[in-house]
């Protein structure tokens, strides 16, 4: 269950930030390993199917590779394809479907324990993002089967009453998409 190689850096998370860190580690001739509990850019896969990013392509680029988009703001699918191409081009040492269980050690000498092995490393970068941690309201009923903390598609809600909590870009975009599909949308906004 142990890897004999000592890495200069272990990166937890294979999202855009984790990939960018791995690219830079490779360019600095640092031995590295990326450990991801899901798939490559796992959080982006959970985004709504036809989502358009609020950022321009330049703000999503990593490693100096251009993100070419057919639009001013890239679509989810274009962005996922882009990160997969960059990871293949850079031949990054990525271990998918491997969950980190714990980290032990001290500066310069860490052991990262996963559900498959233990990894010796001098440095650790935690690039896990925040998508897996929704902002729960801690209100009665939020754990019911029909309550969702992530928006994927609007089609299933056509002709139904839907409440969207929040007022930031993602909430507003979800409300618009739901409305266009015929849902009766109510937005709950703090303040």
Please provide the spans of the model-predicted regions.
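Short glycine-enriched loops at secondary-structure junctions
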Residues: 49-51, 131, 169
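Short beta-to-alpha loop/turn elements within the nucleotide-binding domains of ABC transporters
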Residues: 38, 57, 98
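A short linear boundary/processing microfeature
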Residues: 50, 142, 180-181
């Amino acid at each position: 269950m142990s890897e004999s190689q000592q890495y200069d850096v272990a990166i937890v998370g294979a999202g855009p930030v984790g990939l960018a860190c791995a690219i830079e580690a490779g360019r600095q001739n640092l031995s590295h390993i990326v450990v991801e509990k899901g798939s490559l850019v796992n959080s982006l896969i959970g985004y709504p199917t036809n989502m358009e990013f609020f950022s321009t392509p330049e703000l999503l680029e990593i490693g100096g590779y251009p993100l070419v988009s057919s639009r001013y703001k890239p679509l989810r699918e274009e962005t996922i394809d882009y990160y997969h191409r960059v990871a293949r081009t850079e031949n990054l040492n990525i271990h998918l479907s491997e969950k980190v269980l714990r980290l032990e050690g001290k500066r310069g000498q860490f052991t990262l324990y996963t559900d498959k092995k233990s990894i010796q490393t001098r440095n650790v970068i935690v690039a896990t993002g925040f998508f897996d941690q929704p902002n729960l309201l801690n209100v009665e009923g939020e754990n019911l089967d029909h309550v969702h903390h992530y928006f994927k598609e609007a089609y299933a809600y056509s002709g139904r009453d839907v409440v969207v909590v929040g007022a930031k870009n993602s909430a507003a975009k979800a409300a618009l998409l739901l409305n266009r599909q015929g849902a009766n949308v109510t937005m709950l906004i703090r303040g």
